[in-house]
Regions:
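Structured interface patches
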Residues: 1-195
Length: 195
């Protein structure tokens, strides 16, 4: 099985490195591992479809894509399986790898530029390769609901017997006795006014 980062690598060798150049691609990527949260996710082996446009700009390559995938999970109230269609737009700038500085002034300028950029926010190209993993993962996770429901008016499960409320009668209930008073339940009986 391919590592996650290898599965999302895209070779942009067809795109010339001249500002203003553009290429469009349609991709179907297979996820090597689960992407999502505990209760809902795009499962390993599922396809993620991308309609992608690469634009060459002076700093690097601007990637714009429409992502679509299918997430599987379970309803937080009734635990029924659910499917959720994910449709999300991605736009990221991948910077060209910096050229190695030759002179002292170039090294100083390169250090200042590196200090100005937050390393976590900068996506770098590796030669002609673009790693789409981080933006795809972020787009999917941000589009997933924290508490997925099978329907907005799902009633959930009866806490007493665990059966779905929607399949129970309206009069369904469980007699709950406060454990502090449970010992008195054996004393019950109709009140006898003769004694």
């Amino acid at each position: 099985m391919a590592r996650a980062s290898e599965a999302f690598l895209f070779n942009s060798y067809e795109l010339p490195r001249r500002a203003g150049e553009m290429k469009e691609y349609s991709l179907d990527l297979v996820t090597p591992e689960r992407i999502g949260i505990d209760v809902i996710a795009v499962m390993a082996g599922e396809e993620i479809h991308l309609e992608m446009r690469l634009e060459s700009v002076t700093e690097g390559v601007l990637v714009s894509a429409e992502l679509s995938a299918l997430a599987d999970g379970e309803c937080m109230r009734c635990l029924d399986p659910i499917e959720l269609q994910i449709d999300r737009r991605i736009q990221e700038l991948y910077r060209y790898a910096p050229e190695k500085p030759h002179t002292k002034a170039e090294r100083k300028r390169a250090r200042q530029e590196a200090d100005d950029l937050d390393e976590d926010d900068v996506l770098m190209m590796d030669a002609d390769f673009i790693n789409l993993e981080a933006p795809i993962r972020d787009a999917i996770v941000l589009d997933l609901p924290v508490n997925p429901l099978c329907s907005p008016n799902c009633l959930g499960l009866c806490p007493g017997c665990g059966v779905k409320w929607s399949s129970l009668e309206n009069t369904h209930s469980h007699e709950v006795i406060d454990p502090r008073w449970a010992g008195l339940s054996g004393l019950g009986g109709p009140f006898d006014s003769k004694n």
